């Protein structure tokens, strides 16, 4: 596995930059704008693999995306390979309908330490919840970014990531009550501890998430990719584009329903994804917002 191939995949011109916050931010932003957050394998009759070799083959060689356990595993590998001080962490995602965090460790994120200062880096939450810059591991500090204001809070050794969102304007009234729209301005995202993890810690959950009828990943097919101004999302056959801050403190959210033929074209042109097997788009009833 070649780091230069990874750089080419994310469109990053490596000059063997310093191992500083600027380089870390650039790599994160290049990855989230080149590598989609997606679960399409599940809905093409394929599996979501966890081994680094399989992930590299899928994302770098085949120019696909992946879900958090894959895209953040790849990011962890790349940052470690470059010489950053990295720690793999595990997260518990907030379930809005149940009003609680997941009991299982279903999210992978990365801690990076630069000159004694700790940051959280995550390229695998997608949609409008995706951070665009590393977050300082500081409790109670509002950290404004283009997508929203992020806030980390620590209580008794557990960290909580929350998001303060803008208002949103949906010009197409047909979708004004879409179940894909986030209704909360203050949104809990996930919790985590600083206990170091290995990829093996996620194996059972990786299987569960792609096989259980209770999993949102089996309920909905999705693909999400950040742009310099916003984020594209395809959920089932519904395409959305959110433009952050199109007006003061307001996001613009555009919706479009696609035909089966249009889905293939959109995946190729907007997300850069060409599938080897036929996708069966799915928009089940599990809670999932963009």
From Swiss-Prot:
Name of the top EC class for this enzyme: transferase
Chief localisation class: cytoplasm
Recorded superkingdom: Eukaryota
Positions in coiled-coil regions: none
Effect of residue 99 to I: In allele NAT2*9; slow/unstable isoform
InterPro entries with a match to the protein in the record: Arylamine_N-AcTrfase, Arylamine_NAT_domain_sf, Papain-like_cys_pep_sf
Keyword Hydrolase: no
Active site: 68 (acyl-thioester intermediate), 107, 122
Subcellular location field: Cytoplasm
MF GO annotations: arylamine N-acetyltransferase activity; N-hydroxyarylamine O-acetyltransferase activity
UniProt function note: Catalyzes the N- or O-acetylation of various arylamine and heterocyclic amine substrates, and participates in the detoxification of a plethora of hydrazine and arylamine drugs.
Entry similarity comment: Belongs to the arylamine N-acetyltransferase family.
Protein's recorded name: Arylamine N-acetyltransferase 2
The organism of origin for this protein: Mus musculus (Mouse)
């Amino acid at each position: 596995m070649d780091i230069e191939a990874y750089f080419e995949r994310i469109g990053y011109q490596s000059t063997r930059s310093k191992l500083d916050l600027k380089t870390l931010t650039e790599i994160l932003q290049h990855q989230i704008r080149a590598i989609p957050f997606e679960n399409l394998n599940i809905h093409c009759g394929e599996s979501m693999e966890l081994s680094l070799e399989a992930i590299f083959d899928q994302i770098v060689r085949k120019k696909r995306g992946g879900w958090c356990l894959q895209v953040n595993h790849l990011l962890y590998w790349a940052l470690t390979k470059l010489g950053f001080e990295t720690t793999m962490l595990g997260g518990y995602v907030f379930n809005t309908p149940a009003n609680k965090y997941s009991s299982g460790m279903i999210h992978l994120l990365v801690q990076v330490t630069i000159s004694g200062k700790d940051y959280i880096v995550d390229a695998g939450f997608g949609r409008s919840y995706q951070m665009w810059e590393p977050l300082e591991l500081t409790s109670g500090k509002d950290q404004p970014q283009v997508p929203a204001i992020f806030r980390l809070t620590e209580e008794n050794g557990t960290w909580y990531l929350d998001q303060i969102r803008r208002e949103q304007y949906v010009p197409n009234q047909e979708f004004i009550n879409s179940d894909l729209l986030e209704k909360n301005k203050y949104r809990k995202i996930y919790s985590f501890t600083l206990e170091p993890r290995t990829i093996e810690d996620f194996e059972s959950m990786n299987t569960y998430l792609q096989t259980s009828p209770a999993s949102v990943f089996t309920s909905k097919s999705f693909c999400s990719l950040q742009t310099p101004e916003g984020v594209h999302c395809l959920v089932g056959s519904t395409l959305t584009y959110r433009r952050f801050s199109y007006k003061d403190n307001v996001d613009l959210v555009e919706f479009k329903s696609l035909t089966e033929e249009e889905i293939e074209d959109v995946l190729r042109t907007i997300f850069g994804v060409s599938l080897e097997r036929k996708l069966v788009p799915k928009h089940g009833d599990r809670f999932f917002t963009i």
